[in-house]
Amino acid sequence: MLHTLTRSLRENKGPALVTVLLSALEVVFEIVIPLFMSNLIDFGIEGGSMAAVWKFGAFLLLLAAFQLATGVLAARIAARASVGFAANLREDMFDNVQTFAFSNIDKFSTASIVTRLTTDTTNVQNAFQMLMRMAIRAPVMLIFSMIVSFRISHDISMTFLIILPILALALFFIIRSVFPVFSRVFRTYDELNNVVQENVRGIRVVKSFNQEQHEIGKFGAISERIYKDFSKGERLITLNAPLMQFCIYTCMIVISWLGAKAIIASGNDPALGLTTGNLTALITYTMQILSSLMMLSMVFAMLTISLSSARRIAEVLEEQSDIPQPEQPVMTVRDGAVDFDHVSFVYASKADKKVLDDIDLHIRSGETIGIIGGTGASKSSLVQLIPRLYDVTGGKLTLGGVDVRDYDLDTLRGAVAMVLQKNELFSGTIAENLLWGNENATDEQLRHACELACADGFISAMPDGYDTHIEQGGTNVSGGQKQRLCIARALLKKPKVLILDDSTSAVDTRTDAQIQQALSTYIPDTTKIIIAQRISSVQNADRIVVLDDGHIDAVGCHDELLRTCEIYREVYESQQKGGEDDA
């Protein structure tokens, strides 16, 4: 995990190292200051020498200025390095998500990925910034303050050896108790984000069914769980502060008492024992030792909170796409011939059940294939294998005579245009959305593609035409308009294979027929695979495939299937009857 995260440091390694060095230098100045303060008291104030006061006072001011300068500089560089590190983490996670196959995406919910890109990354950023500063300052200050303290008075400094184990033990139990609590908190954040996303995305459904209070209750229940767990974790962490304060004041009292006895015994003579200046330095070092322990406890507390976040980020960064690039990829797709050679497929999450079994289907280049089947017949699963959104788990699938696993992924997906069941438009103008199909398309090409998809009419009727702004998710266009825009976008790719996955379900039958006629007339060399619920959408196809529970039940033209396929005939008759009833 650590190696995975540190790869994202990149250009921030230098600033991080400089921060560490500056923090160490800051501690050196801080350690030296009490020694000069001791000399100022012993030789200046107690010795009655103003020259010594001026001399050591000047050194103290100079050291304090250097300490301030190094501290401020270290803090600024640490902030810049931590922000850069967080930016790299987000970029690396987002880039890796773009390489995921659908099977990889299935492992992470959308809300979980959003949480990892935001909350988890911020937690790691804060921990990294604290690590660069406190994780260096605290141990260096602790070690050197202990060394100097023992040099001043071995006997009095033994007090630390009693206090330190108590603090270490308490800190161990606090961290061990806190870690599982915060791990649970960040998992619950995923649930909370998921509820928010679902509610915002489906707000029209929520309002139409009067389910606002139900959604508020669902959100409140998860929010309450986060509140309780976070409160529990914070309560455990806050035990650290009073414990540290108790130890600090106990040490101060014990050291002051022992120091006073030693000064009285020595007569404040440095040759005979402890002096007032030594005791002042010792008390200052005591504060430094205990404050360094407090800093360490804060570091451990922050690391405890961020460790869960770091692991969740590492999970995304370490996830390897289930669709690997071939070592020597084929860079050209010859034509749109698609051959399923006894193909089978299972989803990783449901490995015990075959979604597709022994699919043997051979599609000629330029042929129009219709696919009909009931819900759960695996129609979408079948066509998603062609652009390698998933890989076959048995048999062989070829495009243009080449196994799809041998193609360069960009080449393969560039040759296959797919309009999915869930059509997605992005924030921007209509033209910008269409250019996803071909970023170099001219205005004439955009208009021609929209004419084929029967979209040019409603676009031209809009006040801003092709410059009309599309809201997030395409909420300001109807379902049928969205489908036609997505078909036009796919046509701009000029693909070898065009897949329409129930992509005209929201348009009327007349418009559907116009789209099918346009596709047949204007792109005859493109292989067209049309999944539909309405038989009218596919009845003019060269061949129609009837899928039933992941198996091919029948293949043939419309008239042939009416005679030989019971499933097809039942669907056709029910739709015909439904059409008559509607009439």
Predicted regions and their residues:
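Conserved catalytic Walker-motif region of ABC-type ATPase nucleotide-binding domains
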Residues: 97, 219, 313, 340-342
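Transmembrane helices of ABC transporter permease
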Residues: 11, 15-27, 59-60, 69, ...
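An intracellular "coupling" helix at the cytosolic face of ABC transporter transmembrane type-1 domains
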Residues: 11-13, 99-103, 119-132, 136, ...
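Juxtamembrane helix-loop junctions of ABC transporter transmembrane domains
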Residues: 21-22, 29-42, 63-110, 114, ...
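ABC-type nucleotide-binding domain
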Residues: 331-583
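Helix-loop junctions and hydrophobic alpha-helical segments within the transmembrane domains
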Residues: 93, 97, 206, 313, ...
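Helix-loop-helix
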Residues: 49-53, 58, 148-162, 232-312, ...
